[in-house]
Curated annotation (Swiss-Prot):
It comes from Macaca fascicularis. Belongs to the CDC50/LEM3 family. Glycans are attached at N66, N261. Pfam families: CDC50 (PF03381). It is a multi-pass membrane protein. This is Cell cycle control protein 50C.
Length: 344
């Protein structure tokens, strides 16, 4: 018998289960019963989740007021870009029939505004927004430089078109007494946006840091002077600015504008009664046949008054169940045919 050379034996793998590929293995074996069980279970789960989410969304309190036509004079004024420096205000009274308990949030809602256009979304400078280089405007066409070649901060189309209506909610106790409802302008953003994606330059004096730059054409004041009441809410860390810069996926969307400061008269929420929205109308929507609304809403554990997620679960569950019954019918039919074949 011919012996194996010593140098060949040295190359042989160890006689272990791992190296000899003898580890125990499990091969999935899909039977009709197992597949049907998985489909039925998934369908039941999705249907139950969908019903729970829909009922939860229905339990929120929400009031929406479209003020595009109510403030028609202001809308017409804003159609002409040359009137941008002319102030226009309107007051919208409304009645809140029931108390809005707990935390109440104010949103602005836009119709027909396509924030998801590729060139629009890409027209921004992330290097600028994280405070690394405030004069980095390479990706911001067509809003990179002003007419006198000064860098625009914040640059880009999405920043230039920021929503700039001022909305004040007032509680009308009677014909002579009106209380301004306190709204907080902080805590409106996602944590990752506030502390990762947006940062101010290292200098504490933002005016000095932004020297040599100019504001976007549609902005009334520069980025470092957006909030006179709260110095921390200025620069790239301004909550309204961060909320606007998160582009919406659909042409109809709402964005958080403020949240109720539950103090004094509003500790439990918004009491029922007469209210009014006092709006400084700046953001033009009639140019693109759009509309805008202001929304007051409460939240539940799964969010606001949105049926999208609940309907998605319900439709998925219904389709899964339909597929389950179809597969079960096919399985029974084939099984009966097979049995009749053997009985022949």
């Amino acid at each position: 018998m011919e012996e194996t050379p010593q140098h060949c034996l040295s190359r042989l793998p160890d006689n272990s289960a791992l190296k000899q590929q003898e580890l125990p293995a499990h091969r999935l074996y899909f039977t009709a019963r197992r597949v049907l069980f998985v489909f039925f279970t998934t369908g039941i789960f999705c249907l139950c989740m969908g019903i729970i989410l829909i009922l939860s969304a229905r339990s929120t309190q929400e009031i929406e007021i479209n003020y595009t036509r109510i403030c028609a004079n202001c809308a017409k004024l804003r159609e002409n870009a040359s009137n941008f420096d002319k102030e226009c205000t309107c007051s919208i009274p409304f009645y809140l029939s029931g108390k809005m308990m707990g935390n109440v949030y104010m949103y602005y809602k836009l119709y027909g505004f396509y924030q998801n256009l590729y060139r629009y979304v890409r027209s921004r400078s992330n290097r600028q927004l994280v405070g690394k280089d405030v004069k980095a405007v390479e990706d911001c066409a067509p809003f990179k430089m002003s007419d006198n070649k000064t860098p625009i901060v914040p640059c880009g189309a999405i920043a230039n078109s920021m929503f700039n209506d001022t909305i004040i909610l007032s509680h009308n106790i009677n014909s002579s007494v009106q209380i301004k409802v306190p709204m907080l302008k902080s805590g409106l953003t996602w944590w990752t946006d506030k502390y990762v994606k947006f940062q101010n330059p290292s200098s504490k004096n933002l005016a000095d840091e932004f020297r040599g730059t100019t504001k976007p054409p549609n902005w009334p004041k520069p980025i470092y002077d957006l909030d006179k009441k709260d110095p921390r809410n200025n620069g790239f860390l301004n909550d309204d600015f961060i909320v606007w810069m998160r582009a919406a996926a659909f042409p109809t969307f709402k964005k958080l504008y403020g949240r109720l400061n539950r103090t004094h008269h509003f500790i439990e929420g918004l009491p029922a009664g007469n209210y009014s929205f006092n709006i400084t109308y700046n953001f033009p929507v009639t140019r693109f046949q759009g509309e805008k609304s202001v929304v007051l809403s409460t939240l539940t554990w799964c969010g606001g008054n949105s049926l999208f997620l609940g309907l998605a679960y319900t439709v998925t569950g219904a389709i899964t169940w339909l597929a389950s019954f179809t597969m079960m019918a096919i399985h029974i039919t084939l099984k009966n045919k097979q049995m009749s074949f053997f009985h022949q």
